[in-house]
């Protein structure tokens, strides 16, 4: 019998594996809302076929001795477990599935390190802003929807919860798997839409951006909760208006919104002004069936000086242009996913257990220089996620990223059907659900302030 193929952990996977903590599992969650129902047997078959079409996802951590030099992925021909499950329907089914996505990471020892839960006819989720209003036209007046009870949800709706162990995979790769499953299930073309083309801009003049060597601001502590782990709040907003020909993108508007939201929050909580640094994942992979499956994003850090964050309405156009120049320059840089230092840390010259201890120690020592927060903007969902006539096409898609300390807060956005889907995820050691709701309100306010003429 041929032994399974083994692949050494890439740098991102190894660093993540070194720093795992039971209290705050490294999970990514994707939540897809469909207007209709799915046939259970057909969905299981379609998802299994999608896994086979992207065989790199069929992997588990290979066992190894104490003095091994590497962690390795072991590729399998079939899943070790049934990936698709159907929780008991009920009023709390949506809330419970979201909770499981935050507290139960799929094990690395079983192939594949993901799970798909299918919640049928779920009622409103308590403790979350993912109401049953997703995909409907907004009511008149900003913020009105939030304070009104959700209407009765059709018993035919379905929510797909894909939970991913982030040590092995990232959200965009697993969204590709879902798109393939949708195409197999529904027989509809789920090819990605072409990425928007941006006009080539002349190189921006050098600017006096804050140094990455200065300690950035931390998100001020709110009202921490006693239980460990992450909290999550999701909401649906209107996409910010951006005049045609603007020199900035929606991503730049979201970056400015995130910076202003945290600056406002910190000021409310008595923190002195400090530079902010916001980590931004950049993904250059193709979105078609050739997309490499794994952790494929590289991380860049967008700095903001305290003076930039004390702006008036007249300053917003210049602030957006400056942010656009900054993000464009950072995206154009060629660099390793986690920087050059991570490559040295993961060089297999010593036993992996020794490198793990060193990595954890360096992470603790570098905590004061860790970026303030992470903004992951998936952008417009590139696939229709159309499961056919009965189940229909996705009308809302949320992602959330891990929010371990010292950051303690991540912001994830995506757009579907002309709406912006925002997820705020936080460490319970830093914030409570009430704090998350206030940050959501601040985000909505500052997003509106970015709607200006160029």
Kindly label every feature range from the protein language model.
Residues 1-203, 251-275, 388-454:
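Non-catalytic N-terminal regions of enzymes
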Residues 267-268, 370, 381-388:
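Acidic/His-leaning functional-site neighborhoods
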Residues 237-309, 323:
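Long, internal scaffold/assembly segments composed of regular secondary structure
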Residues 295-381:
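Helical lid/core segments from catalytic subdomains that handle acyl or acyl-like groups
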Residues 282, 377, 424-428:
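Active-site proximal loops enriched in glycine and acidic residues that flank catalytic Cys/His/Asp
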Residues 164, 168, 280-284, 379:
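Short, flexible loop/turn elements at secondary-structure junctions
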Residues 286-287, 382, 430-431:
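Flexible loop/turn segments at secondary-structure boundaries
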Residues 200-248, 263, 284:
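Flexible, P/S/T/G-rich "lid" or insertion loops adjacent to the active sites of thioester-utilizing
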